[in-house]
UniProtKB/Swiss-Prot annotation:
Cofactor(s) listed: Mg(2+); Mn(2+)
Cofactor binding notes: Binds 1 divalent metal cation per subunit; can use either Mg(2+) or Mn(2+).
Oligomer and partners: Homodimer.
Subcellular compartments: Cytoplasm; Nucleus
Pfam family, one: Ham1p_like
Species whose genome carries this gene: Aspergillus oryzae (strain ATCC 42149 / RIB 40)
Signal peptide: none
Function (record text): Pyrophosphatase that hydrolyzes non-canonical purine nucleotides such as inosine triphosphate (ITP), deoxyinosine triphosphate (dITP) or xanthosine 5'-triphosphate (XTP) to their respective monophosphate derivatives. The enzyme does not distinguish between the deoxy- and ribose forms. Probably excludes non-canonical purines from RNA and DNA precursor pools, thus preventing their incorporation into RNA and DNA and avoiding chromosomal lesions.
Family: Belongs to the HAM1 NTPase family.
Stated name of the protein: Inosine triphosphate pyrophosphatase
C-alpha cells in the first residue's frame, strides 16, 4: 500500500540505511527522508530511540520514523550497546576485538529499534529486531561500521561478507522493519 499524499518520513542522515529501509519496506509506504540534527540522550537503545522519535515528531510537526542500532557484547555486559558508533569511530573494529580478546565469550547481539510517532504529543511505538552472532576479526567490506566483525550465528559469514539481498532478509534491521510493516499496514486498514 502506498500513499504518496502522506509519505512516511524517515529521519536519518545515513544514505546506506535509507537504501536498506527502502529495500526491506518495498511498497509498504512512500518514504520521504529528512536529515535533521536530533539530540541523542544517554540511555538504552530503547530510551534513545523513544526520545529521538519524540524530538523528530516535534521538529517536523507530524508522523515520523526513526532508528537506532546497538551492538551488545555478552562478555561486556551489553556494551558498547547504543554507543557502538562512538566506539567504532574512536577505537575502530580492531579496538573492539582487542577489548573482547580478554574474554572467552565472543557472543554478541545486533539490535535495531525503530520508533514511530504519529506526531507531536503522541507516544512513540517501538519495533525491535535482534540478531545473534559473535565478534570475529574483521572480514568483508561494509558501509555500516561494525558489520565486518559481526558473524551471524549459523551463517559462518559476517554481515559485511553477506550478499545484500540475503542480509536484508535476516538482519536485525529486517526483523524490526517486519514488525513495523505489519503494524503499519494493519493500522492503515479501514475500520
Amino acid at each position: 500500500m502506498t500513499d504518496s499524499d502522506n509519505p512516511l518520513i524517515l529521519v536519518t542522515g545515513n544514505k546506506n540505511k535509507v537504501l536498506e529501509v527502502k529495500a526491506i519496506l518495498g511498497p509498504t509506504a512512500t518514504l520521504e527522508v529528512l536529515d535533521i540534527n536530533l539530540p541523542e540522550i544517554q540511555g538504552s537503545v530503547e530510551e534513545i530511540t523513544r526520545e529521538k522519535c519524540r524530538a523528530a515528531a516535534e521538529t517536523i510537526g507530524g508522523p515520523v520514523l526513526v532508528e537506532d542500532s546497538a551492538l551488545e557484547m555478552r562478555a561486556l555486559g551489553g556494551l558498547p550497546g547504543a554507543y557502538v558508533k562512538a566506539f567504532v569511530e574512536t577505537i575502530g573494529n580492531e579496538g573492539l576485538n582487542r577489548i573482547l580478546s580478554a574474554f572467552d565469550d565472543k557472543s554478541a547481539e545486533a539490535v535495531c529499534t525503530f520508533g514511530y510517532s504519529q506526531g507531536p504529543g503522541h507516544e512513540p511505538l517501538l519495533f525491535q529486531g535482534r540478531l545473534q552472532g559473535r565478534i570475529v576479526p574483521a572480514r568483508g567490506v561494509s558501509s555500516f561500521g561494525w558489520e565486518p566483525i559481526f558473524e551471524v550465528e549459523g551463517e559462518g559469514v559476517t554481515l559485511a561478507e553477506m550478499e545484500v539481498g540475503k542480509k536484508n532478509g535476516l538482519s536485525h534491521r529486517f526483523k524490526a522493519l517486519v514488525k513495523f510493516r505489519e503494524w503499519f499496514l494493519g493500522a492503515r486498514r479501514p475500520v
